[in-house]
Amino acid sequence: MNAHEALAEIAGKMFGDNAKKVMMVLASNVEVSDEDLAKDLKMDPPELRKLLNDLFEARLVKYRRARDENIGWYKYYWRITDEPIQQILSDRKRLTLSILEKVLSLEENSETYVCPKCGTRYTVDEAENNNYTCEVCGEVLEPFDNTHRVEKLKRAIELLGNWDPSPKQQASRAIPHA
């Protein structure tokens, strides 16, 4: 799998099939305007622009803006990023670990309540403010045992913490050890 195919796979996992299709079109071109992309992929232009912006925020694509002298508007030309995939993945790993660790801390250090009927969760303060009744359906709230969630978060942090996005590490995983 080459770098562009890998980026397309990543985009597909993050944003869905349309993102993968966009990345594949961009991989076969130097630059493509969002208008041409929309035509090629038969996508609604505003939907495509939102997807391109999501891909840009994820650092998977870049753009160049040029003024159309005839109408005075800007045209945007998109291309696949030139950043190393490993750097993008390492940064995303770091960000994801940070978020997971914050969520774990909240889960371990706070008491929550849940509605047995509709499943809405409440912090202890929210539960107290509502007299331990659900705002949605009026049921009496029950303490929520988040032990399972805490264990899942710890496992996810462990797995992600041990994951190395470098090509050398990925190649060694593909080869069975004797």
UniProtKB/Swiss-Prot annotation:
InterPro entries: TF_E_archaea, TFE, TFIIE/TFIIEa_HTH, TFIIE_asu, TFIIEa/SarR/Rpc3_HTH_dom, WH-like_DNA-bd_sf, WH_DNA-bd_sf, Znf_TFIIB
Entries under SUPFAM superfamilies matching the protein: Winged helix' DNA-binding domain (SSF46785), Zinc beta-ribbon (SSF57783)
GO biological process, alphabetically ordered: regulation of DNA-templated transcription; transcription initiation at RNA polymerase II promoter
Disulfide bond annotation, renumbered to this chain: none
Domain named HTH TFE/IIEalpha-type: residues: 3-86
Transcription is among the record's keywords: yes
GO molecular function: DNA binding
The protein's assembly and partners: Monomer. Interaction with RNA polymerase subunits RpoF and RpoE is necessary for Tfe stimulatory transcription activity. Able to interact with Tbp and RNA polymerase in the absence of DNA promoter. Interacts both with the preinitiation and elongation complexes.
PANTHER family (UniProt xref): GENERAL TRANSCRIPTION FACTOR IIE SUBUNIT 1, TRANSCRIPTION INITIATION FACTOR IIE, ALPHA SUBUNIT
Name of the protein in question: Transcription factor E
